[in-house]
Structures are given as C-alpha cells and as structure tokens.
Amino acid sequence: MPEEAETFAFQAEIAQLMSLIINTFYSNKEIFLRELISNASDALDKIRYESLTDPSKLDSGKELYIKLIPNKTAGTLTIIDTGIGMTKSDLVNNLGTIAKSGTKAFMEALQAGADISMIGQFGVGFYSAYLIADRVTVTSKNNDDEQYVWESXXXGSFTXKADNXEPLXRGTKIXLYIKEDQTDYLEESKIKEIVNKHSQFIGYPIKLLVEKEREKEVSDDEADDEKKDDEAKKDMDTDEPKIEDVGEDEDADKKDKDGKKKKTIKEKY
C-alpha cells in the first residue's frame, strides 16, 4: 500500500519569497538553470569529498555527472545529479520548513531593486525554479536513507513521501513542470545557450538528452525488432554539455511509392 504523502507548510519567509518570485515579472528567468546546476555541482562536491575518506560512499554510483532532460510532450525539464542526495529530513527542512538566513535579506534586496540573478548569493537559488515552472518535484536518495520525493505547486505548502518509483541509487532528480508561456526552455538550443553562458566552469560533465528525427528504410521485421546499439557521444566543445545517446523511439511507420516500409525515428542522443 503506497505511503500517504505528508503535507507541510512553507516557513513564512519562504512562502513570501516564492510569492514574490511567482508574481513579479523578471526578464532574465534563465538564471534558474544556473542555480539548479550550481546546486547539483555542490552535491557532487560533497559526495566526492566524503569518498576521499570512505571510498565505499561511491558504491551507490561511481560516475559523477549532471544530466538535463527536456521533454516537450510532458512539458518537463528534468535535472539529475549523482551527488550526495538528501534524506527525508533534508528535503523537508532545506526545501521548506527552515528559512535560510539569506531568505529575508534577499527579499529585502529584491524589493530595493536588486536583480533576481543575485538569488544564489543568498543561498535560496532553488526557488528560482518557480520563475519558469508552476510545479516542481524533487526526488532524492541519500546513502543514509530511503528514496523520498518532495513536491510543491507553491500555494503555501509542499508534500513529502517515500518514493517507490524508479530508483536513483544516489543523488537528486528535479522535475520542472514548465509554465505554458515558458516552453522555450525545453528547446535544445536554448538549454545549450544557457549552460554555455552561465555554467561553463562546472567541474562535472553536463549531459543533455536531445531528440532527433530521421527517416530510414526497414523491412517489416526490422520495424518491429530493430534496436540501435551503438552510442553516439560527442563533445560539442570543451565548455558545452556532453551529448549522450540513450536510444530511440519509433513512430509513424509508412510505405513509400516503391512499397518499401519507412519509419520516422525519434532518436535521443
């Protein structure tokens, strides 16, 4: 039987900050991605540091990276890291019930005309996700706890519960449900541009999963059975995210005028 989600009220200053972020117009919303990548990098630093004295800390996943997954169909942008992860109490305390010391100071700075891009300096960069998302879920797995998921569509409260979905092994997965008027942040070119502009000095690989379509001729059997094995990895250049092939989706089977079956393949690289 699935565990009931617990509901928590945001601490008053955090609720105020979120309201300010959601209800005020800011032109440079793109800084949300810089903040979430920066947080992911910090989490990776922490597990790497712990592993220096206890290498077994990396038994739950040796590869340290950040992965970005835009999904236009679902309207989501997902940011995954294989960092230290958060326990249930970390999720509840750090993302809602205990205000960081910079929360009030940042609100005062904003109201005095400071730019939203300063949010990370006050330690509350996570909430910049609400510049472009109307709902956020944070799934996290720390070596010392089970996997939990945090969720909030703002409105003053958030939920947390044990997560029995796909196991992360270790790390954090943030899913942003993008606002209808912000879907350009699901475009590959836009994501690359932001990463290159704001996150070029991150010390871990940033992998971007993208989808491409091509047509190819196949036999009827191949249309059902064919799977692509080889990985096409390319580095766009040293500062850009790494592109990783994770397979393909098939659709739109059709026959051309010669009777040869064709299919449009959506490939994720």
Curated annotation (Swiss-Prot):
Its main location: cytoplasm. Keywords: ATP-binding, Chaperone, Cytoplasm, Nucleotide-binding, Stress response. Residues 213-269 are annotated as: Disordered. The keyword Cytoplasm applies. It holds the Pfam family HATPase_c_3. Coiled coil: none annotated. It comes from the Eukaryota. Residues 260-269 have a biased composition (Basic residues). GO terms for cellular component: centrosome; endoplasmic reticulum chaperone complex; perinuclear region of cytoplasm; polytene chromosome interband; protein folding chaperone complex. GO terms for molecular function: ATP binding; ATP hydrolysis activity; ATP-dependent protein folding chaperone; insulin receptor binding; TPR domain binding; unfolded protein binding. Residues 225-245 have a biased composition (Basic and acidic residues). GO terms for biological process: centrosome cycle; cold acclimation; membrane bending; multivesicular body fusion to apical plasma membrane; negative regulation of cell population proliferation; pole plasm mRNA localization; positive regulation of insulin receptor signaling pathway; positive regulation of neuroblast proliferation. It is found in: Cytoplasm. ATP binds at N39, D81, K100, F126. Homodimer. Interacts with shu. Belongs to the heat shock protein 90 family. This is Heat shock protein 83. The lineage of its organism: Eukaryota, Metazoa, Ecdysozoa, Arthropoda, Hexapoda.
